UniProtKB/Swiss-Prot annotation:
Name of protein: Kynurenine 3-monooxygenase
One Pfam family this sequence matches: Pyr_redox_2
Cofactor dependence: FAD
Enzyme superclass (EC): oxidoreductase
Compartments in which it is found: Mitochondrion outer membrane
PANTHER family, alphabetized: KYNURENINE 3-MONOOXYGENASE (PTHR46028:SF2)
Family according to the record: Belongs to the aromatic-ring hydroxylase family. KMO subfamily.
Disulfide bonds, paired cysteine numbers: none
Organism: Mycosarcoma maydis (Corn smut fungus)
Length: 600
């Protein structure tokens, strides 16, 4: 199923670029990163087709299904900057919509700012005579009042998808499951016509794709013909449709074959072939595009899982009034003091219940609800959390305040009927194949969700890639440079995401962590950010490359280490000087005591 909906009253502004961009781009996966990339290409004059294996995510069924498995997203500086690098559909960068809002503003309007963490610590267990007691500890994210923004993934995706559909250069194809891709189709076709063998290319490049599981989300739009408006020869046989090229063309460089869901009750699916000049792989951690590239080039690739899974839960609103209800308390959705009757918990906090090997988190939504995620080892889901009695016992002991808000019956139903989802990370290198394909988003660097940087990093991919593309005439030179410059940053954020899981589950209540946090806050209040900034602030509230963030943090740790050693040496030296200078007082007493002990 394809969809094209254009705003005919809005003229499409083309952004300036030095690069000779491809005529037709295929974006595989219609998720947030894919939609943003599609808009960026479309605004530079490219015809874009977005291909998505799943149905339209804007339907009620799709929204309900996504709410059961998707972790809320935390949008911060890198993601906001990435959104602002791509203008609204039909408008140039730096040009606001009539109401003065840009794409980032539209997304932020549908988010809830979180200025701090709220740590929930059980200080007294429940007993027969008294209720459990939970202490809440607020930890500000920034000394400058900066916030991260909780946004529903489906809502964000639909905003970007709507704006992609508004652009006249974009077409979206839903329920198109990629089956095979030939990145060198034009080379092979030309060699076949000339009667000469094509250059040596691994013949297995496409075979692996048959029946592959595609989980991606971004794709790019095309003319209704799917072939750039050129003449085509179409043949149909046994439910398959093949659009044959009418001669060698720049848009014939890459061939993509899809299985397409059919509404015909006699034919469950049909086959469809599309051609493109360039492919953007935004098809998630199990990327088919990445696997196809890996069979053609020497790609370094790892996919690691951790022994922790997650299940989504929900805290409903206090009332049905939603985010527009009467202000109360100390936490409003506008980031200022004041709250709303709809929220059971402070709305401007990311709530964490750290319990070492497992934890619960809750992020606010505009309607007053909280999206909760329980992270725990798989063996815990299979044992303590597999029965009603076990679930209630775990929550009464570790999350008594959350249990009262979630509702015991709904909690038990969620944990006994839903399967825990896996968590893992992907690392690969390079991110491109010649000037024909590139990987961005989770397809290039899926990461653990504990730093809240997955989406932000994906949006930053788009910004960084086009910053480089716009400065170079050759697309291949630009992509070579993108891989070279981006790889150290992506390795760094993958490591930071793994480290932050340990911090959230263990360290947030430890005295070394709290001491370092206070020291960072003190130094940041008296020194400029160029001289001192916390690791979290550099990662979340700046666009500093991730690799430089890690180097800066190591330097700051070294400074603190040297300062502690110097302080210890100074203390010992001062004590030694004090002892020596007062020897006239303690030396006679010491001599007499030793003499008495000796005589006895």
């Amino acid at each position: 199923m394809s969809e094209t909906r254009k705003d005919t009253d809005r003229a499409s502004a083309q952004l300036p670029t030095k690069c000779q961009l491809p005529e037709r781009v295929a974006v595989i996966g219609a998720g947030p990163v894919g939609c943003l990339a599609a808009l960026a290409f479309a605004q530079r004059g490219c015809k874009v087709d977005i291909f998505e294996s799943r149905p339209d995510p804007r339907t009620h069924e799709a929204i309900t299904r996504a709410s059961q498995r998707s972790i809320n997203l935390a949008l911060s500086t890198r993601g906001i900057t990435g959104l602002r690098s791509v203008s609204l559909a039909g408008l140039g960068v730096g040009t606001n919509a009539p109401n003065g809002m840009d794409l980032a503003d539209l997304v932020l309007q549908n988010s809830v700012p979180m200025r701090a963490r709220m740590i929930h610590v059980v200080t007294r267990q429940a007993s027969a005579t008294q209720a459990a007691e939970v202490k809440e500890i607020s930890q500000l994210y920034s000394t400058k009042g900066e916030s991260i923004n909780s946004v529903d993934r489906g809502r964000l995706n639909n905003i970007l998808l709507e704006h992609a559909l508004m652009h006249r250069n974009v077409e979206v194809h839903f329920e198109h499951k990629l089956q095979s891709v030939d990145f060198d189709h034009d080379i092979k076709s030309a060699a076949k016509r000339a009667g000469t063998p094509p250059p040596a290319i691994d013949a297995s490049a496409n075979k692996w794709l048959r029946g592959a599981n595609v989980t991606g989300g971004d794709s790019c739009a095309d003319e209704p013909s799917g072939c750039g408006g050129r003449k085509q020869a179409t043949t149909k046989s046994q439910g398959s449709e093949y659009v044959a090229p009418a001669g060698t063309s720049a848009v014939d460089r890459v061939r993509l074959d899809f299985d397409v869901h059919s509404t015909n009750q006699h034919i469950r699916k049909t086959s469809n072939t599309h051609y493109a000049s360039f492919v953007v792989g935004c098809d998630g951690a199990h990327s088919s595009i990445r696997s196809a590239m890996g069979s053609l080039i020497r790609m370094h690739y790892t996919h690691n899982y951790i022994d922790t899974g997650y299940i989504e839960l929900s805290i409903p609103p206090r009332t049905s009034l939603g985010s527009g209800s009467r202000i109360r308390g100390s936490g409003g959705v506008d980031g200022k003091r004041g709250g709303h009757d709809a929220f059971h918990l402070d709305a401007n906090h990311l709530h964490i219940w750290p319990r070492h090997s497992f934890m619960l988190i809750a992020l606010p939504n505009l309607d007053g609800s909280f999206t909760c995620t329980l992270f725990a080892p798989f063996k815990m889901f299979a044992s303590e959390l597999s029965t009603k009695e076990g679930i209630v016992a775990v929550f009464q002991q570790h999350f008594p305040d959350a249990l009262a808000l979630i509702d015991e019956e709904k909690l038990v139903k969620c944990l006994t009927t839903r399967r825990a989802s896996a968590l893992g990370s992907v690392q690969c290198d390079p991110y491109h194949y010649k000037d024909r394909a590139v990987l961005i988003g989770d397809a290039a660097h899926a990461m653990l969700p504990f730093y809240g940087q997955g989406l932000n990093c994906g949006f930053e991919d788009v910004r960084v890639m086009f910053d480089i593309i716009d400065q170079h005439e050759s697309l291949q030179v630009a992509l070579d440079l993108y891989t070279k410059e981006r790889h150290p940053d992506l390795v760094a954020i993958l490591q930071l995401a793994e480290q932050n899981y340990r911090e959230m589950a263990h360290s947030v209540v430890s005295w070394p962590y709290l001491l370092r946090k206070k020291l960072d806050g003190l130094l940041m209040s008296i020194l400029p950010s160029s001289m001192w900034s916390s690791l979290y602030a550099m990662t979340t509230f700046s666009n500093l490359p991730y690799s430089r963030v890690v180097k800066t943090e190591k330097r700051q740790q070294a400074i603190i280490g040297h300062a502690l050693v110097a302080t210890a040496v100074a203390f010992v030296s001062a004590a030694a000087v004090g002892v020596y200078s007062t020897r006239a007082l303690w030396q006679p007493v010491t001599v007499r005591c030793i003499a008495r002990l000796h005589n006895s």
